[in-house]
Amino acid sequence: MRWRTIQARYCFLLVPCVLTALEAVPIDVDKTKVHNVEPVESARIEPPDTGLYYDEYLKQVIEVLETDPHFREKLQKADIEEIRSGRLSQELDLVSHKVRTRLDELKRQEVGRLRMLIKAKLDALQDTGMNHHLLLKQFEHLNHQNPDTFESKDLDMLIKAATADLEQYDRTRHEEFKKYEMMKEHERREYLKTLSEEKRKEEEAKFAEMKRKHEDHPKVNHPGSKDQLKEVWEETDGLDPNDFDPKTFFKLHDVNNDGFLDEQELEALFTKELDKVYNPQNAEDDMIEMEEERLRMREHVMNEIDNNKDRLVTLEEFLRATEKKEFLEPDSWETLDQQQLFTEEELKEYESIIAIQESELKKKADELQKQKEELQRQHDHLEAQKQEYQQAVQQLEQKKFQQGIAPSGPAGELKFEPHT
């Protein structure tokens, strides 16, 4: 089984959290002539980074499990609920000894890695009185009570931890984007306060003009609508719009031939629409906003099409969606520039948080400055004492010389001048 087939079943585990734009893969036009496209084995595709701090461990466990024929067969037949509930994890008891041995080794390596992280954290905090075993409990993707062998409970915990973490990922991205937009507006207003009235009016006019230029773009098709998909068919795939066929379209954009449109493949379909609104060469277009728009489009299409909420679109789900009225006559799509991303109350609350953080940073900076000044004072005092000591030694040597006493060395020994 290829990795992407495994990824399809573990979609909620390994769905890629892509932050950068994904271009649609160019398609050979002749491929559309074959409507019953057979899946073909292609070169191994590296699994995407999930963004989880245990990403490498997760991928290695999946790679080892896919080498066991029994587990692979069970995985192919399992539905998402069976995987999520932990019933599939019980099949681990039936895998080969070789696979179990490799899983045991992976777990020991992961436990060792986590212990090194904990030690580094404790060393940084200079706190050696904490219990390492208790600290291991904060890592919920493995059974810390048994650090030596990989059991069904480990697989169950790994699945549940990754599921929860990835489901939270999109929500976190939306929250971070909102904070980003509020920070931009906060900094803009703070900058205006530093300007004269004339300069402020010029900046306000410049801002309004950039906003107008950004909003002046071609109509954006409703994501997942017939018009949107036909535009991809014609302009990206280079095909005749009159020959548009949903089934062929699905197979063309199922890039890895695994029978699903995953989140990467879906997001690639929106590049043409996003190009209408965002251009990296234009000062008025923000590429971070473009990625938020891409995320919103993907989430919308998934909510409309993905009936079993497994974060994958099957051919059946895709074709069923093309039969709906909304596919032919969708509502207009509102881009980010047509929406209020935050209220004045939310901005004021965010600014109050920033003010508190800045106050704390200023307090720390003042404390560091005082420490620096105290260290400098101590340094100057030591330098002054050093100079006084050197002067005293010189005066003593000079006095001894005047009295005809041989000068002494650093350890007090007598120094005799050679006779000439």
Curated annotation (Swiss-Prot):
Highest rank taxon of the organism: Eukaryota
Residue interval(s) of motif GBA: 304-334
Binding site for Ca(2+) 2: 306, 308, 310, 317
One GO-annotated biological process of the protein: negative regulation of glucagon secretion
Primary location recorded for the protein, binned into one broad class: Golgi
Domain comment, as recorded: The GBA (G-alpha binding and activating) motif mediates binding to the alpha subunits of guanine nucleotide-binding proteins (G proteins).
Residues the record lists as binding Ca(2+) 1: 254, 256, 258, 265
Residues annotated to bind DNA: 171-223
Domain EF-hand: 241-276, 293-328
Signal sequence interval, chain numbering: 1-24
An example Gene Ontology CC term for this record: Golgi medial cisterna
Gene Ontology terms for molecular function: calcium ion binding; DNA binding; G-protein alpha-subunit binding; guanyl-nucleotide exchange factor activity; tumor necrosis factor receptor binding
UniProt-recorded name of the protein: Nucleobindin-2
InterPro entries attached to this UniProt entry: EF-hand-dom_pair, EF_Hand_1_Ca_BS, EF_hand_dom, Nucleobindin
Protein topology in the membrane: Peripheral membrane protein
Binds to necdin as annotated region, ranges: 213-420
Modified residues (Phosphoserine): 332
Function recorded in the entry: Calcium-binding protein which may have a role in calcium homeostasis. Acts as a non-receptor guanine nucleotide exchange factor which binds to and activates guanine nucleotide-binding protein (G-protein) alpha subunit GNAI3.
Compartments where found: Golgi apparatus; Endoplasmic reticulum; Nucleus envelope; Membrane
Complexes and interactors: Interacts (via GBA motif) with guanine nucleotide-binding protein G(i) alpha subunit GNAI3. Preferentially interacts with inactive rather than active GNAI3. Interaction with GNAI3 is inhibited when NUCB2 binds calcium, probably due to a conformational change which renders the GBA motif inaccessible. Binds to the postmitotic growth suppressor NDN; coexpression abolishes NUCB2 secretion. Interacts with MC4R.
Annotated Low complexity bias: 387-396
Keyword tags: Calcium, Cleavage on pair of basic residues, Cytoplasm, DNA-binding, Endoplasmic reticulum, Golgi apparatus, Guanine-nucleotide releasing factor, Membrane, Metal-binding, Nucleus, Phosphoprotein, Repeat, Secreted, Signal
Bias type Basic and acidic residues, positions: 366-386
Family named by the database record: Belongs to the nucleobindin family.
